[in-house]
Swiss-Prot record:
Its EC number is 1.2.1.70. The gene is hemA. GO terms for molecular function: glutamyl-tRNA reductase activity; NADP binding. It catalyses: (S)-4-amino-5-oxopentanoate + tRNA(Glu) + NADP(+) = L-glutamyl-tRNA(Glu) + NADPH + H(+). Gene3D superfamilies: Glutamyl-tRNA reductase, N-terminal domain, NAD(P)-binding Rossmann-like Domain. It comes from Xanthomonas campestris pv. campestris (strain ATCC 33913 / DSM 3586 / NCPPB 528 / LMG 568 / P 25). Belongs to the glutamyl-tRNA reductase family. This is Glutamyl-tRNA reductase. Pathway: Porphyrin-containing compound metabolism; protoporphyrin-IX biosynthesis; 5-aminolevulinate from L-glutamyl-tRNA(Glu): step 1/2.
Length: 432
């Protein structure tokens, strides 16, 4: 089995394609279930965020994985990147460390990788191979972020959006801000907004209790999502990041809100994939819509300033990839020995138990021992004997040469005879 990663991200695919490829809510467990039944796939995990969808798998053939992804979202194949074995390990280490993120060093991705691991594990999609890889990934990411400044004062997509809002509204503290959703991205936006102060903070969410929790923490007002129409016109700035499959803010809603506002400008940040705000909202005058792709350009300065720390983190990852691959190779070399030892031990235990049962049933010990010896010999030598017979028929010189090394001939060699004790008697000793 080979380790594969196939995926697309903000660098390889536009947002409309990424939102079609995303696995949100219950779609992720269902996708893992459909992967598990593929005979070519032994283990699998799915990482799905607003900026990437990636499939990690232990599988024979990547084309099976490509076909599965293309069935989920037709048209993906031309945008996919693909890594195997050591490069797949390196990719996951870089992703979890934040080196492959839109915002270099952003901290949220490590939690998202942990979530992907936890969901795959809970649904029985992980085996020892991927489980060990993810555990090592968490360790490497922690070390890279501890030993370098790649994670120092991280700039997230949410904080970048808040900064743009502050630059667009010189007096954001006199503005009303509406947050749609209550997940991690909205939590970060609420945190940054409360630090900078806003006149009024509205938080709308499908589950009102979650919105109330955020509102209590950051001095906002919680609203059920069903009341979005009534309050949208109050917002000077809107941040939206839900897990909905369809837009929660439509063009019709924004048009109505702008009329109510008497064309007073409205700034909207769509931080979700799939998108929360209909793309055609950008066509409306007085509505200024930013998507996650727009924010990538805004964070490029941050990426350059953190490049030195990233180079240090890359060096740590290079070392850890080499060590991880070396450990895997050592385990692979030991695997045949472990299987051979396990086969010998299980055969011995099975036949020994049978011999003991025969002894307890009163069978003569000599007969039991002879049968045990023959059975052990036959059981242990049958697999290599059959393999060597096939090798001879197929002219497999590698296997026959290996057998010569394993069982060398020693002409003239004989096992030393077992010494028989000499019992002296009076008759055997002549009289002096």
């Amino acid at each position: 089995m080979t380790l594969w990663v196939l995926g697309l991200n903000h660098q390889t695919a536009p947002v409309d394609l990424r939102e079609r490829a995303a696995f949100a809510g219950d779609a992720l467990p269902r996708a893992l279930d459909s992967l598990r039944i593929l005979p070519q796939v032994r283990e699998a995990a799915l990482l799905s965020t607003c900026n990437r969808t990636e499939l990690y798998a232990m599988a024979d053939d990547p084309q099976t994985l490509v076909a599965w992804l293309d069935m989920h979202a037709p048209g993906l194949s031309g945008y996919l990147y693909q890594h195997r074995d050591a490069e797949a390990v390196r990719h996951l280490f870089r992703v979890a460390t934040g080196l492959d993120s839109m915002v270099l060093g952003e901290p949220q991705i490590l939690g998202q990788v942990k979530d992907a691991w936890a969901v795959a594990r809970a649904h029985g999609a992980l085996g020892s191979g991927l489980d060990r890889l993810f555990q090592q990934t968490f360790s490497v990411a922690k070390r890279a972020r501890t030993d370098t400044r790649v994670g120092a004062n991280p700039v997230s997509v949410a904080s970048t959006a808040v900064r743009l809002a502050q630059e667009s509204f010189a007096r954001l503290n006199e503005s009303t801000v509406l947050l749609v959703g209550a997940g991690e991205t909205i939590e970060l936006a609420a945190k940054h907004l409360s630090e900078g102060r806003v006149r009024r903070l509205l938080i709308a969410n499908r589950t009102l209790a979650h919105a109330q929790t955020l509102a209590t923490q950051h001095g906002g007002v919680a609203l059920p999502l069903t009341e979005l129409d009534r309050h949208l016109a109050e917002a000077d700035v809107v941040f939206s990041a839900t897990a909905a499959r369809e837009p929660v803010v439509t063009r019709v809603q924004v048009e109505q809100a702008l009329r109510t506002r008497k064309r007073k400008p409205m700034l909207l940040f769509d931080l979700a994939v799939p998108r929360d705000i209909e793309a055609s909202v950008a066509e409306l005058s007085d509505a200024y819509l930013y998507t996650v792709d727009d924010l990538e350009r805004a964070v490029e300065d941050n990426r350059r300033s953190r490049r030195e720390a990233a180079d240090q983190a890359e060096a740590i990852i290079d070392l850890q990839v080499a060590r991880y691959v070396e450990t895997l190779q050592a385990n692979e070399r030991q695997a045949p020995l472990k299987r051979l030892r396990a086969f010998g031990d299980s055969t011995r235990d099975e036949l020994l138990a049978k011999a003991r049962q025969q002894l307890s049933n009163g069978k003569p010990a000599d007969e039991v021992l002879e049968q045990l010896a023959h059975a052990l010999t036959n059981r242990l030598l049958h697999p290599p004997t059959a393999a060597l017979r096939d090798a001879a028929l197929n002219n497999d010189l590698d296997l026959t040469s290996a057998a010569d090394r394993l069982f060398p001939e020693k002409p003239g060699y004989r096992h030393p005879p077992v010494a028989t004790p000499i019992v002296r008697t009076d008759d055997a000793n002549p009289a002096p």
